Each structure stands twice: as structure tokens, then as C-alpha cells.
Amino acid sequence: MSKLMQDLIEEYVEAIKKIYGSHVCQIILYGSYARGDFRPDSDVDIMILVDMSDLELKAYAQQLSYMTYDFNMDNDLDIKPIAKSEEMESLF
């Protein structure tokens, strides 16, 4: 992964933290970028685990969507975040 891409992902992670604040438990890069077999047209898969209920998560969904859209357009990226309750993840 290029230094530029690392910097962009770090910038995106900081934007996530601004949205969810102290509710962020973990932010996980997965998929082709995590495995190292990405291509120039690969998307960037990011999972956001937060300590809030699914109902609370829905209140943040639009803000995450708008921020991601703007970030993708500004940087010619295809970041695809998934926000999940850490409580639900621990059940699996």
C-alpha cells in the first residue's frame, strides 16, 4: 500500500472518530487492502465497531454516509464502511 493511501485511510479514520467519538471501540481494515492483494480499482473495506445499540447506530448512519461520500469524491476513492455494534459482533 502506498504512503498516500495509508495517509488517506488514517485521515478517514480520524473523520470516523469525529462522528462516533468515544463510542469507537475498534476500526478494522479488511478485504483486499488488508490482505495486500488490492488493485487500482479495489474498494477499501472498513468495519467500525462501536459501543452503542443498533438503534443508536442508525442515528449516525446518514452522517457517516455523507462524510464517506464527500471523502470518496474528494480523493477519488471507494471506501465502503460498515458500522456495527460491538455487542452484536461478540455474539458471533
Model-predicted regions and their roles:
Residues 1-26, 35-40, 51-92:
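Catalytic core of pol beta-like nucleotidyltransferases
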Residues 32:
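Recognition helix of helix-turn-helix/homeodomain-like DNA-binding domains
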Residues 45-49:
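Short beta-strand->loop micro-motif that forms the acidic, two-metal-ion catalytic signature
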